[in-house]
């Protein structure tokens, strides 16, 4: 079963027709009255990145991928929360320092600020990022129509190439 099938079958009814949840199929939560836009993404080692030898590259990939959910909606990200699970081999002082340095560079580049998170010791390496922005309007995925223009930044396929490189 694919992601959208799982969401539709098991979770969409839980949103209780909350219009802000966008039927759980548009990558973000959007509360128009509060101008609040929120996105959450989880990244698992061996699925979303294959090597943690260069934590800087992994952090760049996952943070940029997460905030892109807001950016593609026309929303400027403002805050993010990051949670990580790992063990003594992945959460070494060296790696934690690299993660911190990379987050600092990305914050400066995109004008975003860390606002919280969590760390858990586990044999599985993973990260979850919640991105938060504010806007009175967003671009809805499900409102795309035939003959709409599509704009792409960078090269198509770069995401896949970076995945096999990491």
Name each model feature, range by range:
Residues 43, 76-162:
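Glycine-rich anion-binding loops of enzyme active sites
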Residues 1-71, 134-136, 148-149:
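N-terminal glycine-rich phosphate/pyrophosphate-binding loops that anchor nucleotide-derived ligands
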Residues 164-166:
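Conserved small/polar residues in nucleotide/adenosyl-binding loops
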């Amino acid at each position: 079963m694919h992601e959208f099938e799982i969401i539709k079958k098991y979770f969409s009814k839980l949103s209780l027709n909350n219009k802000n949840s966008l039927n759980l199929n548009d990558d973000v939560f959007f509360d128009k009255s509060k101008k609040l836009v929120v996105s959450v993404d989880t990244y698992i080692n061996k699925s979303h990145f294959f090597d943690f030898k260069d934590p800087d590259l992994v952090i760049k990939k996952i943070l940029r991928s997460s905030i892109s959910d807001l950016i593609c909606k026309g929303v400027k990200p403002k805050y993010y929360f990051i949670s990580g699970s790992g063990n003594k081999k992945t959460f070494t002082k060296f790696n934690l320092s690299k993660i911190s340095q990379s987050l600092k560079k990305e914050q400066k580049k995109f004008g975003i600020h860390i606002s919280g998170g969590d760390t858990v010791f586990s044999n599985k390496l993973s990260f979850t990022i919640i991105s938060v922005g504010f806007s009175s309007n967003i671009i809805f995925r499900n409102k795309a129509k035939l003959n709409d223009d599509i704009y792409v930044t960078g090269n198509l396929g770069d995401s896949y190439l970076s995945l096999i490189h990491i």
